[in-house]
Amino acid sequence: MLTKKEQRLRRSRQTRIRIAQQGVARLTVNRTNLHIYANVISDDGSKVLASASTAEAEVRQSLGAAGKGGNAAAARIIGLRIAEKAKAAGIQKVAFDRAGFAYHGRVKALADAAREAGLQF
């Protein structure tokens, strides 16, 4: 019997395979209790084209004195930021890779913000 973590990792591997067949860059999301990370990875998986996280100094300053990166408001900031960076790198369309995390809460907030900022997925 697989643990929750093993199940999530298995789902993420299967998703990565499906996304690789599409031939578009992928927007990956990783979340921890304290931070959320987003990367735009090239279609062949060899390069990180853009990245944003709540661990960045500029983002921590914009979050205020509390500096909490583990909430939906912080995820929304990261979604807007990753969309800006991806557009600056010339990327308009991505495949969303949630890495096995449920599409709820912080992951959903990041995805919605990235869509609002102009990324298509």
Swiss-Prot record:
Annotated SUPFAM superfamilies: Translational machinery components (SSF53137)
Isomerase keyword on record: no
One GO CC annotation: cytosolic large ribosomal subunit
GO terms of molecular function: 5S rRNA binding; structural constituent of ribosome
GO biological process terms, semicolon-separated: translation
Keywords: Ribonucleoprotein, Ribosomal protein, RNA-binding, rRNA-binding
Pfam families (alphabetical): Ribosomal_L18p
UniProt key word RNA-binding: yes
CDD domains noted in UniProt: Ribosomal_L18_L5e
Protein task: This is one of the proteins that bind and probably mediate the attachment of the 5S RNA into the large ribosomal subunit, where it forms part of the central protuberance.
Record's subunit section: Part of the 50S ribosomal subunit; part of the 5S rRNA/L5/L18/L25 subcomplex. Contacts the 5S and 23S rRNAs.
Family the UniProt entry places it in: Belongs to the universal ribosomal protein uL18 family.
Matching NCBIfam families: L18_bact
Name used for this protein in its record: Large ribosomal subunit protein uL18
Species: Verminephrobacter eiseniae (strain EF01-2)
Phylogenetic classification of the source organism: Bacteria, Pseudomonadati, Pseudomonadota, Betaproteobacteria, Burkholderiales
Gene: rplR
